[in-house]
Amino acid sequence: MTRASRRHRVHRYTADGAVSARADTVAGEEPLEIRLGGRAFTVTMRTPGHDFDLVGGFLVSEGVVSAAEQVVRMDYRGGVDADGRRSYNVVDVVLAPGVVPPDTSMERHVYTSSSCGVCGTASIEAVTKVSAFGPAGDGVRLPVAGLLALPERLRAAQRLFDTTGGVHAAGLFRFPGDDDGPELLCVREDVGRHNAVDKVVGWALREGLLPLRGTVLQVSGRASFELVQKAHLAGIPALAAVSAPSALAVELAEQTGTTLVGFSRGASFNAYAGRDRIAG
């Protein structure tokens, strides 16, 4: 099986001129080809691990599936690495009868990089999708203290980041009660922030939890248009980020009724959209 991290020999240089050799741990990044019924659909760069969750979440974000029963099975297909070992870098998905596969306008003409999940889509229209779950009517209340606690809770769960310092994370939380702290439901890490989110959504798909009403998605980096879209398609009413959102992310959050929080650090955050859900 491919690995989420690998050891690599590095040379460390310091300001005083000293040079030392040591082993360092770096995050894994390998291609994953996604096939639908044996037909190539896309190739994405990802950190190996939770691949079926990644594929499931990706299909949700493409508007292909919205429930676990719409996926008959996922299997690793053939493929070997340079040493002749099985690579586990090809996943084939069999969709349930009646599930319409993506049309040609949605197919990826180039690979999907770990930093961009919509790069290579065949048309602008294919980027903006309609959710089966729209979160606009979700009346969940989000306590300020609870939202402020999310980045630290997410950081404490980042095991791969602890060893590599080179991956993004996405964590799904909920608040059981007004006076209760955040409950972590799932955390996933990946070199690509959109992959980490897909892995969380794919976990929820597999567990039969979609739509994800009453939850908050906390991410370790910035909030892009694509992350707001992925949250929207999974029925997640709130997205929080430790860094800034983009202008298009704010616009989409306003249009979809998604609560969007940015610069969530220390004792403050900014609410860019959907502040009516935030309870002081």
What are these regions (language model features)?
Residues 194-272, 277-280:
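Feature captures the catalytic cores and cofactor-binding loops of soluble hydro-lyases/lyases
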Residues 1-187, 191:
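Intrinsically disordered, low-complexity regions enriched in acidic/Ser/Thr/Pro/Gln residues
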